[in-house]
Amino acid sequence: MFHARMESVKPSRILIGAAAAAILFLFLLWPVGLILFYPTLPGAARVLANEHWFEALWHSIAMAVLAGGTATVLGLAYAYALVRIRVRWSGLLHAIALLPILAPPFVISISYILLFGRNGLITKQLLQMRLDIYGWKGLWLVQTLTFFPLAYLTLANVLRSIPGNLEQAASNLGASNSRVFRDVTLPLLRPGLVASLLLVGISVLADFGNPVIIAGDFSMLPTLAYLKVTGWFDLDAASVLASLLLAPTVVLFLIQRVWLGRRSYVTVSGKTSQQPHPPAPVWMARAACVVSYTAAVLIVLVYGILAYGSVSQAWGYDYSLTLRHFTQLGRRIPSLANTMHYSLLGAVVSVLLATALAYVVTRKKILVPGTFDFFATVPAAIPGLFLGLGYVVAFNQDPLRLTGTSFIIILALGLWNLPTAYRYAMANLAQLSEQLELAAANLGAKPVRVVSSITMPLLRGALLAGGTVTFLRNVTCLSVIIFLVTPRTPMATTDVLALVEGGEWGQAASLSIVLLGIALALLFGGIRLIRHIGQELEL
């Protein structure tokens, strides 16, 4: 009877796997494939014959390497200061480092322009100088500050996982603190450093909000593809440019999976160790403290100046305080309402699909579970601009015409954030024994009852955590929806971009502050809710 019940569970897994595969094909592989094969040969040849596009490709790759490197170094210093040195106010510094993750990605660009632009508070009012923040230097600084928290969180986890006995053993053998760091700590940090560099590099390549605002004449593939669609509606050229953008991001993604998957940096043996870590080298402790405090002050300055800009009469000319920018946000209520509505439904799509995929992968009762795992994580390598353009091409005709509707936005957000929700679902499902489900089935429970009464309640923490984080990402998303919004389906982030392009800095700053406030409220609400069931939210 027990084995009979085991067999009764399998068809449900096959059904779940088939449904998940159909959704992945229709709303992920199909749009991606259409963009790759959309351009006609003459159209592709016309685009590729223009050296300007390859210059933009080179610029994008170079910026990924440059910003990825500086963000990783900054993240390492920040993580070392908080985890190993444990500087004063570490909790506050950690919270400050999360702000760029929670805020819309273009917020730092707006703040940099308010500070260092042609009418900037520092450049014009304080220093009486003309400094052109637009271009590759401004973009490099902005993307470093925007994405260094990704490196910080990755490296902080790696530093916490390194046991003190390894470094203490080297110290007991006579190695200096600097030698211990160079020969023991740094090699153990290598997988984290590579992961950080690749993660930030992918994020920089896929970034759209910062380049479109602050890159100026420094051509980047995302901005050129955007201009080709919005300015000329040249889908041939936009598809080629988006495909050029996809290539390096997928390469970095595959390197990350293969390189980190094949290397073993085992530091935990059968015996646990409570030995403390030896003191950090003096020079590094001082440098890490200076870097971390400087970065934190700069982040606070960035968001402080954004708040100041939201209550200034006319930035660059009249700095007297006013609330008119906030009172004028009444006409943005439909955009804010749509943002909350679509973001919530998109998070539901992400969580449900991620849970289904994690279920069939961890239970391994289907063919090629590794294939499902790969396609559940591959959206992390797809720039949002590329996926959004794919949806425009794929769903602009019968029998599945979705353009101009809210459904296309919800589905795009849901599929784009699938890897985030999948990570939480996999981490929790891997810890749940299959014997619980089999025991319930053996007692007569139907497959649906097994999932609803056993599996799902045990996954509450993962569902809430994945839903909270994907909800946050949806609220502040710009790239994936830029081609999908219409006058009937406006969203707040695209409104901010329109305000920036129109020079309405006060309105743009006030709407950005509202979005940041919504993101913080969602985060704190999610943390409280998850703690209520006895778990913690890990970003």
Regions found by a protein language model. Give the residues of each.
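Peri-membrane helix termini and adjoining interfacial loops of integral membrane proteins
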Residues: 35-45, 114-127, 214-222, 263-272, ...
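A short amphipathic helical element positioned immediately N-terminal to and/or at the very start
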Residues: 3-5, 42-49, 321-330
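Short cytosolic juxtamembrane segments of multi-pass membrane proteins
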Residues: 166, 264-277, 436, 529-539
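Flexible interhelical linker loops that connect adjacent transmembrane helices
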Residues: 259-291
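Membrane-water interface segments at the C-terminal ends of transmembrane alpha-helices
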Residues: 10-42, 51-160, 188-209, 238-258, ...
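Glycine-rich helix-loop "coupling/hinge" segments at transmembrane-helix boundaries
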Residues: 114, 207-232, 318, 478-505, ...
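Short, Lys/Arg-rich, polar N-terminal cytosolic tail immediately upstream
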Residues: 1-11
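Short helix-to-coil transition segments within interhelical loops
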Residues: 49, 85, 160-163, 168-189, ...
